[in-house]
Design a protein with these regions (language model features):
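P-loop NTPase Walker
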Residues: 1-58, 235-238
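Short, polar/flexible loop-turn hinges at active-site or ligand-entry regions and domain interfaces
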Residues: 11-15, 35-37, 51-67, 161, ...
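Conserved helicase motor core of SF1/SF2 NTP-dependent helicases
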Residues: 21-24, 41-44, 161, 165, ...
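A polyampholytic, Gly/Pro-enriched intrinsically disordered region
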Residues: 56-76, 214, 240-248, 316-347
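Conserved phosphoryl-transfer catalytic core
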Residues: 57-85, 188-201, 217-226
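Accessory N-terminal region flanking or inserted into the helicase ATPase core
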Residues: 79-167, 176-181, 204
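Conserved interdomain hinge at the start of the Helicase C-terminal
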Residues: 259-275
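Conserved helicase C-terminal RecA-like lobe
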Residues: 320-394
């Protein structure tokens, strides 16, 4: 934040854009940036806002895919089930859509995308090409759009607002499509600041290209001392680097703590009842047994999928938590939250109970909801109108 504070001393805050790769990074930045006039956003949210896209009516997601399946006979029996990951991109189970999304993000032909994803043997690429062609036609005729269009159309339609300085965070995980958007914004700006670490790239499976970050030109300011990694973990990480085919050579020192590594300990033997824990697994499937274990212990936890609770309840909990942290949220997220707020319980002013009152919202924080949308609820998530039988699983 040092460079941002420096810019705020000499630049109109409304002409500063802070672009974060993930929703989590954007939320964290909103908590740390005290000047409300600075534009803090993910690329998708920024593009959607400037393009004035209606994500509730024209974004292809969920049931909205039914229209396309009726339009394209070859897609009638295909599933378009997906979830939106932290970077704002849909993750499809359908191999054709995996290839199409990857190709758009990487800016490469479909057959090359299928090869890189190792789907060239199991997927009919000619069918993939026809699905893509039908999808383009359908969007042209209906005005529907996909998540990637929030970025590509932002550039194509020259929608960048007046910006003097742009900041980019977590740059190592940007795809070529996202880099196009950043370079376009940068071309409209006087100064740019880019933060990232190619060693931390994790989204290559959806098209991230750390080589673009590695090859950037400009003045560098290496952050040598780690604030997180103790010596033991640092030593393990250093042993991995020689096996990486391409990386930016850098000096990197551990923080002043020893740290510990425990190998081959069954998760059943770990005491999760004290402290805060983050559990990472290589695949989502591996989390299933861990989640069941947490349920058995009556421990509260947050995960992308909690089958014992309705998705809208989990989303309402997350949205309320984010709002209390100072984050901005969109109207789609708020609609789930509003289902658990009532006038009777003092959560809302009379006349604001219907989530239809939220239609004009693009992005808003807790203060805005209190000032303009009748919100009166305050406190932890327990005040939400959740069934008592469900609260123990949150």
């Amino acid at each position: 934040m040092y460079y941002l504070e420096h810019e705020l001393k000499q630049t109109d805050p409304s002409k500063i854009a802070y672009i974060a790769f993930s929703n989590a990074a954007a939320d964290e930045a909103k908590k740390r940036i005290t000047n409300d006039n600075v534009i803090v956003s993910t690329m998708h949210a920024f593009g959607s806002r400037e393009l004035q896209l209606n994500t509730s009516t024209h974004l292809l997601k969920g049931d909205k895919w039914k229209g396309f399946k009726n339009f394209s006979n070859i897609c009638a029996d295909l599933s378009f089930e997906s979830y939106i990951n932290e970077s704002g991109y849909p993750q499809y189970k359908n191999s054709h859509m995996k290839i199409i999304e990857y190709a758009k993000n990487k800016r490469i032909p479909l057959d090359e995308a299928a090869l890189q994803l190792e789907l060239h043997y199991s997927t009919d690429i000619y069918l993939t090409e026809q699905i893509q062609a039908d999808l383009i036609t359908y969007k042209e005729q209906t005005g529907m759009f996909e998540y990637s269009d929030m970025i590509s159309k932002f550039v194509e339609e020259d929608k960048c607002p007046p910006i003097h300085t742009v900041f980019l965070d977590e740059a190592q995980d940007l795809s070529p499509l996202q880099w196009e958007m950043f370079f376009y914004i940068e071309s409209k700006s006087q100064r740019s600041y880019v933060a990232g670490d190619d060693d931390q790239t994790i989204y290559t499976f959806q098209g991230a290209d750390p080589d673009i970050f590695i090859n950037l030109k400009g003045i560098t300011d290496p952050q040598i001392k780690s604030r997180r990694v103790p010596r033991t973990i640092h030593k393990l990480a250093e042993s991995i680097f020689p096996h990486m085919s391409q990386r930016l050579e850098k000096q990197w020192e551990p923080r002043d703590a020893e740290g510990k590594i425990y190998n081959d300990i069954p998760y059943q033997d770990i005491d999760f009842s004290t402290g805060n824990w983050m559990v990472l697994t290589r695949t989502n499937k591996m989390l299933t047994a861990l989640k069941d274990h947490m349920y058995d212990l009556n421990l509260r936890f947050e995960a992308k999928q909690q089958e014992l609770l309705p998705k809208r309840m989990v989303n309402a909990y997350r949205v309320w938590t984010r709002l209390n942290q100072g984050a901005f949220v969109n109207k789609e997220d708020l609609k789930d939250l509003w289902d658990y707020l009532t006038v009777k319980d003092g959560h809302l002013v009379r006349g604001y109970a219907s989530n239809k009152t939220l239609e004009s919202i693009t992005s808003i924080d807790m203060e805005g909801l209190r000032a303009e949308y009748g919100l009166r609820a305050a406190g932890s998530w327990e005040i939400l109108n959740f069934p008592e039988s469900s609260k123990m699983y949150i």
